[in-house]
């Protein structure tokens, strides 16, 4: 099971260079398992035991496995994650031609570690909107090949490089794509028109707009002397999306189960398809007959917010509280913050710990050092919007928000096992 899950995760990461591609990959896997797509613009005719999914903005997805009994009786088991990761996104008018090189201006998306983006073989993917035969359409593209790089400045020209330096995103991050003649002018949108023709065999009249991200072309891989680790891009938080999907597909539950994977978590979740928007609430309201049933059902439900946790790094162990240093390959982490940066409380933490003990899955705890600030997740946002009880958990990770992150190769199986048990649980606290 562990090897198959790890291989599946690596394949999923490769197919998901952007939130758009991640959502499409999740939808493809759901459809292969018999899930039916629901269109938010249509009326829904769902049936007990039915399997459905809905997307918004092509970058967020909610999968629903309706129970044979009404959700009002035993509540809904929900797992939440997010599809986005920090990256470099192309600006609307990006062409830069400097010193005979074609470069693209980029904007930093989210709280990225910037130094690891240098000297990497980069490709470009995302969503393109165009006009064809008088109609406005959109399509996903992925160049796949390494078409760009951000070369470092040689240490001979920057003698203090190893003493730390502040990276200027405006000046130092535009990737180089090609050499060009002095009088040659490159139209980036024309390049996108060519890519649409290559990848999808369609001829666009004009590219109207796009949302494109650079990404590292190096595939995720099992690494380490004994294969103890998985190294790859976007583990935060496609790792949790994949674990939630596998648990949902494996759970033969009579209860109603939901997996929600939101976009825009890395930039605050405040969007129509983010956790701070109405997507999940509106979806649940459409599944329940009236307002009274909705409130009662939510109060009988529970959300597991799954997002990567900071593993204790052997070179920087002092960055953790001495009693709360999550270790890689030692199981999922319950995340606690009394200032509500995480939504965990004693009841939800106790229930998750109970599930882990019942499944013989190791479990850990994390609380940030008292002299450091704490990050957050979709957990508190979802809890405050729905009023649903929530526990924040995640798998220990190194180099979070780097272009290449690291997690334990045993932990995915641990997380899938306990999330499957959660979906199967007959009673919630």
From Swiss-Prot:
Record has Chloroplast as a keyword: no
Phylogenetic classification of the source organism: Bacteria, Pseudomonadati, Pseudomonadota, Gammaproteobacteria, Pseudomonadales
Group of enzyme by EC: hydrolase
Source organism per UniProt: Pseudomonas putida (strain GB-1)
Highest taxon above the source species: Bacteria
HAMAP family for the chain: Aminopeptidase_M18_2 (MF_00467)
Name the UniProt record assigns to this protein: Probable M18 family aminopeptidase 2
InterPro entries xrefs: M18_aminopeptidase_2 (IPR022984), Peptidase_M18 (IPR001948), Peptidase_M18_dom2 (IPR023358)
Gene3D superfamilies, alphabetized: Aminopeptidase i, Domain 2, Zn peptidases
GO cellular component terms, A-Z: cytoplasm
Record-level GO BP terms: proteolysis
